[in-house]
A protein has these predicted regions:
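Extracytoplasmic ligand-binding site segments that recognize negatively charged/polar headgroups
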Residues: 46-58, 74-81, 96, 100-257
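Hydrophobic residues within well-ordered alpha-helices
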Residues: 86, 113, 259-264, 310
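Mature extracytoplasmic/periplasmic domains
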Residues: 301, 306-375
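Short, polar/charged alpha-helical segment
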Residues: 29-37, 44-70, 162
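Periplasmic-binding protein-like
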Residues: 144, 158, 238-241, 276, ...
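N-terminal signal peptide c-region/cleavage motif recognized by signal peptidases
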Residues: 21-23
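Conserved C-terminal helix/tail region of periplasmic/extracytoplasmic solute-binding proteins
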Residues: 261, 368-401
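A ligand-binding cleft/hinge motif common to bilobed small-molecule-binding domains
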Residues: 110-112, 270-289
Length: 401
């Protein structure tokens, strides 16, 4: 391990949690740190964000300095690739030397691995910085209605927002029911990603919350009867909206970045995003004009937490725990909250921090391209993962040529 004098403030902070721990827990964590030294942690994560990749590069430098852990990001196009890999290794009897140590995961992918018993843990409560997490938030205790139970550790939150260019449109719909009328007045100026992409399904699920006769049914595993009743108003609503979408609703962008490119190119004026800071970051990078604004629908929008999980057969579990713990450190969370990094709210309970730690967050500046913090406080829980699967399948049957 490098000498403490060579550590940055963030790296030192990753170790200070030991001071506040009970002796037995401190001894256990010290053992984790010892085993982690020299380990190479392979972190499978969606690699479609330059901001995320840059942030993980910063995290890599910090855990190398504080704990002699080498973090290697393995970029994925879809987290399902990691799930498939772990399942394949289980089938092949590769139970002790898996190729994945840590996964950025949530929702259906977490549910799939947890259901099969393919996750290591529970481990989250063993992390010193876990005591700082804002456990009062439902989206941190439940992942798409599935109890987390310590098998994954949160590191950031996200919420569905809508981004528009105020230079071209002054008023945007703040209620799902108003989208068809708005689209009729602005034909071709709104779209959302295809439903094979999580953002496309999220937009439809947001509409379901507003239109279903009983939104509470979305918190339970889907049944054929419940699906038919809940989605009947959705299909009627979409029939009104579709003709006025970009390219008449016959084509959809493949992903969030592809959708944003349409906004950059002036092909659309309004789009959904699951990252409240994405527009602000794009403005600062010179990719979107300063006239861009971000809004949240009245009554709240879907929100969730991003987690990291450790496969049952990870070869470097101790190193993976060190990385997960560092992601929860006040220094790492404050860095993630900066627009030059990721932006967005922390998963920490600020009341659990010291005055010096809270100051890291209070120094953050609110930009006009982000929604006001108060608008992000009303978070709707994600539906049970089975709804997304059924919704995507029904969509493809109805609208795929």
């Amino acid at each position: 391990m490098r000498a403490p004098a060579a550590m940055g403030g963030a790296a030192v902070g990753a170790l200070l949690g030991l001071l506040a721990m009970r002796p037995a827990m401190a001894s256990s964590w010290a053992s984790v740190l010892t085993r982690a030294r020299g380990q190479h942690v392979y972190f499978d994560a969606w690699g479609g964000s330059e901001r995320f990749n840059a942030y993980i590069a910063w995290v890599s430098r910090q855990v190398a300095a504080c704990c002699d852990v080498t973090l290697r990001e393995v970029p994925l196009e879809d987290t399902a690739q990691a799930v498939t890999q772990v399942i394949a290794e289980k089938a092949a009897g590769q139970n002790h030397a898996g190729t994945i140590d840590l996964i950025w995961i949530n929702g259906p992918n977490f549910a799939a691995l947890k259901r099969r018993g393919l996750l290591y843990g529970p481990f989250a409560q063993r992390l010193p910085n876990d005591r700082l997490v804002r456990r009062s938030d439902r989206e941190i205790r439940y992942d798409f209605t599935v109890p987390v139970d310590g098998y994954e550790s949160p590191w950031r939150t996200a919420q569905l927002v809508f981004v528009y260019d105020s230079a071209y449109v002054k008023h945007v719909p703040l209620d799902i029911r108003a989208f068809p009328a708005w689209a009729r007045r602005h034909p071709g100026r709104f779209t959302f990603p295809q439903v094979q992409n999580f953002l496309g399904v999220a937009f439809l699920e947001q509409a379901l919350y507003a239109l279903a006769p009983d939104p509470a049914v979305l918190q339970r595993p889907v049944t054929s009867a419940a699906f038919a009743q809940a989605t009947a108003p959705l299909w009627a609503w979409f029939a009104e909206l579709r003709p006025y979408l970009w390219r008449h609703g016959r084509e959809y962008p493949a992903s969030g970045p592809a959708e944003r490119q349409l906004l950059e190119d002036g092909e659309i004026d309004l789009m959904p995003s699951f990252d409240p800071a994405s527009a602000a970051a794009a403005v600062l990078a010179g990719r979107l004009p300063k006239s861009v604004r971000t809004v949240v629908l009245r009554g709240g929008t879907l929100g969730n937490a991003s987690f990291v999980a450790i496969p049952y057969n990870a070869a470097h579990k101790a190193g993976a725990m060190v990385v997960a713990n560092f992601l929860l450190s006040p220094a790492a969370q404050a860095r993630a909250g900066e627009l030059r990094a990721l932006g967005g709210p922390t998963v920490l309970d600020l009341k659990a921090l010291t005055a010096a730690q809270r100051a890291l967050f209070q120094a953050q500046v609110h930009d006009p391209w982000m929604p006001p913090p108060a608008a992000l406080r009303h978070v709707l829980p994600e539906p049970n993962p089975s709804w997304a699967v059924r919704l995507a399948a029904a969509w493809e049957r109805r609208y795929t040529p």
